[in-house]
């Protein structure tokens, strides 16, 4: 039995992950490959919607309960959308691709400070991943953009969806913030090891150029 190839797209907000996931899916399907794509969190089901709502309610109030709730939300998505596709005795797909995975928990669900509480929180999440034998991906494509481009994209996306720019928290997108988030991703990828490797891809340039870089890395 040939297991599906499991690819994760990670990156900061506004990095272009969703676009690149779709482009890769279309490219692979043009080769006759069977491709399943999902995202984490998957807000298309009611349970994930409820868990996400509760996670956001806990934000900045109780970092541990927020982290546990976020893990529960992601683990629910994993059990529903990902694990069955990877472990089926009769695989229905050649590729399983997700827009975000558990690595985002390490980057987004704790305040950006270095202290014992945060470190213990990281180890707590890592312990749960190992306890439940959560499957590591074969490869991670990490898309990165500079803060100015990130802010521009967040503003553009917020306006397109009719949102409130004043509530978009644009001040969080700074060089220092981005560096800290990437540092957390690297920690997570080192400790929750992927099978083959990861690549940092610049998401700031031309969409097609980024797509070509991703195809080259994945050798597809």
Q: How would you describe each model-predicted region?
A:
Residues 123-137:
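Membrane-proximal helix-turn-helix segments that form the acceptor-binding/catalytic region
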Residues 17:
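Conserved lysine of the Walker
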């Amino acid at each position: 039995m040939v297991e599906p190839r499991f690819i994760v797209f990670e990156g900061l907000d506004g990095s272009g992950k969703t676009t690149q996931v779709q482009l890769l899916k279309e490219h692979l399907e043009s080769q006759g490959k069977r491709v399943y794509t999902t995202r984490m969190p998957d807000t298309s089901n009611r349970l994930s919607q409820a868990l996400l709502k509760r996670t956001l309610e806990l934000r900045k109030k109780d970092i541990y309960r927020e982290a546990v709730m976020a893990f529960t939300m992601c683990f629910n998505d994993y059990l529903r959308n990902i694990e069955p596709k990877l472990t089926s005795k009769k695989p229905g797909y050649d590729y399983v691709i997700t827009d975000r995975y558990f690595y985002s928990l390490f980057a987004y669900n704790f305040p950006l400070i270095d202290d014992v509480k945060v470190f213990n929180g990281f180890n707590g999440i890592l312990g749960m991943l190992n306890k439940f034998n959560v499957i590591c991906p074969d490869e991670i494509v990490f898309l990165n953009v500079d803060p100015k481009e990130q802010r521009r994209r967040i503003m553009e996306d917020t306006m397109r969806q009719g949102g409130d720019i004043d509530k978009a928290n644009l001040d969080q997108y700074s060089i220092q913030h981005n560096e800290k988030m990437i540092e957390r991703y690297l920690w997570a990828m080192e400790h929750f090891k992927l099978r083959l490797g990861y690549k940092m891809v610049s998401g700031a340039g031309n969409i097609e150029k980024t797509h070509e870089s991703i195809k080259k890395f994945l050798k597809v």
